[in-house]
Structure formats: structure tokens, C-alpha cells
């Protein structure tokens, strides 16, 4: 049977093959080409005897990346039996410059295949599984521990690069509500809309669906973009990682976003404000077909929507070096009250690049987030407990009533080489899952990012 152990053996074989290939190219190539494990090379396997650089010049960029995350429940949580969990993801990618290869003006093709494996300390120790933790202390875990087609798209620019059109297989968070993923806590990593819109609505990495996106430059540093994405919950299933047909589709996700990329005092910033509308049916979180009867079905709504704001701005340099310094960030998402478990989400924090002169590439990050349960969803939980005569939290039949969850993380990123970053971190979770009965948790973690 093909299982996690089989995937692990296949992953090791992929790494071994790439390293062996890189070594062979290095031995046969020019002496000046970066060899395997060269700290200044783009990847661990080096420049393949100059072949990697030659391919890049011709428009071919092949990559193999790995992200691994360790989580240890140091204190608190639902289950206080101490242990550690490891989750990881391999990404095999290709980016082709179609202008260099075929002469297609300003055209790019991107392909990415991912494989996830491992376990999550959040599920195993921190959460009360009757009301799981909203965030995750190991963001790389999730969406199925399996192989997936994550990107397969083509984009092309027109009108002196003012207009860009993109079509193929990709997720909403790749272009809309986008945000970096340097933190290990999910509430501080990546597009947040996908975390709180609902598990079957907005698909973040590594899920892809058929989609199209049009982006236009309204003025220097000001862009507007719109998109249309297939809404197909069956794509979440583990055995549908490479599904290309439209069976199981339920509607469309239609996002729109205004993007501003100013320079303030010659320092870069990025600001996004946007909204999405879903044409798919969604269940109301409180209203019943038979009012007051919790055994009846929830009312079905014919749409769903939400809004977001993302802000990032570098505010200082370090000794006059603009590549180093302090940056601030914030994220806000708001969901419709009729169909959303999470009503709104707020996040803020800072990063500092090159804090120490001896380590100019290292980075430090501190972030906090609050996930707020929709009051209508909470009222439904209370009604269920009342109807079932449940008042004791320790009774397995009791439905924990969810409020606000708070997540915080402090990390230090050691840029050991150009292709290896190690980020030890400490995370604090107050009221995991918004459940006040669950002890506040401390998690020690390590995030590793490597390019081969």
C-alpha cells in the first residue's frame, strides 16, 4: 500500500537524484561553476557545472524546494503529554520564459507539484478536537498529506506590460490577499482569507483549481485585478490531487483587489484592499429550516462574501543600508455573518532584516493575531447544548462554546546559506480554538526552508 513511509522513501530518492545530478554536472563542468553545498549558490546542488546558469539564460528555471517544521508542546494545551511532531513539504517546480524559448512576448509558464507529509502537534496535543484550534502551530501541515498539482498556469503581459492576463491552475492566495510566509504559525503566514473564509471556499496553497486573473496598472505603483476561480470542494480530497475535470463544481469565487506599491522615504511598501463573492450555496451558521428546532437542517444561502486589508511597509534602514531595517505589517479580514464561523480576523507585527552587522542576511519576526468567532455561530453552539441538556465541559457530548483565539510568535531566521534558512521560534496560543476551558499553550518550533 502507498502510505506515508512510501512517500518518505520517494522524497529521499528525489533528493538523492537531484544531488547526484548536480554533482555529475559539477565534475564535468567549468571550474568556476558553484559546486554542491557552495553557500553562495542558488541551490544546495550548486550550478551543475554551469548547466543551471545556462538553462536559466535560455529561459528554463527548474527548482526543488523543501519546507520542514518541528512543533513541541512545551506547556499547556488540551493534552499536556509532552511530545514533538514534524511536518514537511517538497515542491518540484519549473518556470519557463516563453519569450526566450518560443518568442512569445512577455509570456511565462509555471508548473509546481507538491508533496506533504508528517503530523501536526496542534491536532495531537493543543486542540480540543470537538472545537479545533483555528490557527496551526505548523502551517505547512494541512490540505491532505499527499501529492498535488499546485500550479500549472501561463501568463502574458500586454500594452507595454500595463495589462497582465493569467490562466490555468492556481489558488486565490497566489495573487489576491497575498502575504509572505516566514512565520510558522498559520495565523501569521500567507493569505489569511483562505484560513477564515471556510475550508471549502478559498483555496490556499497547495490546492489549485481552474482560474483566470486579469491585472491592470491604473497608474505608476497602482494596480487593480479581478479573478474568477472554480469552486469545487472535491479538490480537497486526497485522491483528487491531479484532478483536471470540472465534476463536483458548485460555482465561482470572484475576487477583486486594489494594489498599491509605494516607496515611502525610498523604502518599499505594499497595500491591498479587496473583496470576494462566492456564487456557491453555503449553509447559514444559525438559522434553521424549522426555527428553534436544532434537529432541523440549517438554512441554505445562495452566496457568500468577505473583505480584506493587507499592509506592509519598511520604515527604517540599518546604517543607511535599504536592504536592512525594520518593516511593519497588518492584516484584517471580515466575513459575512450569515455563513461564516469566523466573523473577523486581525493580525499585526514586525520584521527586522540584518539586525546584527555580523549577520546582515538574518531576520527577526514578531507577530500577534486574534481570530474571532462569529456570535451567530456561537449562539448556535449554545442552542445545541441547551437542546441536549449539556452543561458540563468534560462531558464528551458537550459542544465547547468558541470565542476569541489569540496567537503570537517570535522567530529568529538564520540565513545559513543562500539556499538554507533555519528559523527557531516560540509560539503562544491563548484559548486554542477560542475555547477558554483549554489551557493556554506554549509551543517551541523550528522552521527549515531549503532549495536544492
Residue ranges with predicted function:
Residues 2-4, 8, 12-69, 73, ...:
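N-terminal periplasmic/intermembrane-space "pro-region" immediately following the signal or transit peptide
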Residues 46-62, 97-109, 159-162, 221, ...:
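Short loop/turn motifs that connect adjacent beta-strands in outer-membrane beta-barrel proteins
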Residues 53, 68, 96-100, 155-158, ...:
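Residue-level signature of outer-membrane beta-barrel architecture
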Residues 62-70, 109-115, 165-169, 226-230, ...:
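Transmembrane beta-barrel strands of outer-membrane/channel proteins
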Residues 72-88, 102-151, 246-248, 434:
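Surface-exposed loop and membrane-interface regions of Gram-negative outer-membrane beta-barrel proteins
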Residues 122-153, 160-254, 385-397:
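Surface-exposed coil loops of outer-membrane beta-barrel proteins
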Residues 242, 257-259, 275-305, 316-319, ...:
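Outer membrane beta-barrel transmembrane domains
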Residues 440-452:
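Outer-membrane beta-barrel "beta-signal"
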Amino acid at each position: 500500500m502507498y502510505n506515508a513511509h512510501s512517500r518518505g522513501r520517494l522524497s529521499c530518492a528525489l533528493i538523492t537524484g537531484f544531488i547526484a545530478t548536480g554533482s555529475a554536472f559539477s565534475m564535468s563542468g567549468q571550474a568556476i561553476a558553484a559546486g554542491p553545498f557552495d553557500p553562495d549558490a542558488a541551490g544546495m546542488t550548486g550550478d551543475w557545472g554551469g548547466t543551471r546558469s545556462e538553462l536559466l539564460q535560455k529561459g528554463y528555471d527548474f527548482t526543488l524546494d523543501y519546507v520542514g517544521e518541528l512543533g513541541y508542546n512545551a506547556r499547556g494545551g488540551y493534552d499536556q503529554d509532552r511530545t514533538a511532531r514534524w511536518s514537511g513539504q517538497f515542491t518540484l517546480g519549473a518556470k519557463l520564459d516563453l519569450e526566450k524559448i518560443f518568442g512569445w512576448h512577455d509570456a511565462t509558464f509555471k508548473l509546481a507539484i507538491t508533496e506533504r507529509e508528517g503530523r501536526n502537534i496542534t491536532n495531537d496535543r493543543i486542540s480540543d478536537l470537538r472545537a479545533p484550534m483555528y490557527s496551526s502551530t505548523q502551517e505547512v501541515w494541512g490540505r491532505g498529506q499527499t501529492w498535488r498539482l499546485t500550479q500549472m498556469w501561463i501568463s502574458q503581459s500586454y500594452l507595454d506590460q500595463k495589462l497582465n492576463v493569467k490562466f490555468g491552475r492556481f489558488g486565490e492566495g497566489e495573487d489576491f490577499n497575498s502575504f509572505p510566509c516566514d512565520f510558522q504559525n498559520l495565523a501569521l503566514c500567507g493569505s489569511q482569507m483562505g484560513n477564515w473564509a471556510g475550508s471549502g471556499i478559498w483555496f490556499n496553497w497547495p490546492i489549485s483549481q481552474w482560474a483566470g486573473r486579469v491585472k491592470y496598472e491604473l497608474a505608476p505603483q497602482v494596480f487593480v485585478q479581478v479573478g474568477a476561480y472554480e469552486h469545487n470542494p472535491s479538490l480537497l480530497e486526497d485522491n483528487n490531487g491531479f484532478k483536471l475535470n470540472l465534476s463536483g463544481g458548485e460555482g465561482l469565487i470572484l475576487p477583486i483587489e486594489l494594489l498599491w506599491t509605494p516607496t515611502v522615504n525610498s523604502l518599499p511598501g505594499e497595500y491591498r484592499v479587496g473583496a470576494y463573492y462566492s456564487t456557491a450555496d453555503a449553509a447559514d451558521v444559525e438559522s434553521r429550516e424549522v426555527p428553534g428546532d436544532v434537529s432541523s437542517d440549517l438554512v441554505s444561502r445562495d452566496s457568500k462574501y468577505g473583505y480584506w486589508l493587507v499592509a506592509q511597509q519598511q520604515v527604517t534602514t540599518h546604517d543607511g543600508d535599504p536592504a536592512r531595517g525594520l518593516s511593519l505589517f497588518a492584516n484584517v479580514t471580515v466575513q459575512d455573518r450569515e455563513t461564516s464561523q469566523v466573523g473577523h480576523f486581525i493580525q499585526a507585527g514586525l520584521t527586522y532584516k540584518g539586525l546584527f552587522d555580523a549577520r546582515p542576511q538574518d531576520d527577526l519576526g514578531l507577530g500577534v493575531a486574534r481570530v474571532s468567532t462569529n456570535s451567530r455561530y456561537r449562539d448556535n453552539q449554545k442552542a445545541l447544548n441547551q437542546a441536549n441538556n449539556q452543561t458540563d465541559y468534560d462531558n464528551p457530548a458537550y459542544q465547547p462554546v468558541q470565542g476569541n483565539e489569540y496567537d503570537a510568535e517570535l522567530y529568529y531566521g538564520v540565513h545559513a546559506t543562500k539556499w538554507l534558512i533555519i528559523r527557531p521560534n516560540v509560539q503562544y496560543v491563548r484559548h486554542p480554538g477560542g475555547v477558554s476551558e483549554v489551557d493556554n499553550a506554549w509551543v517551541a518550533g523550528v522552521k527549515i526552508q531549503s532549495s536544492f
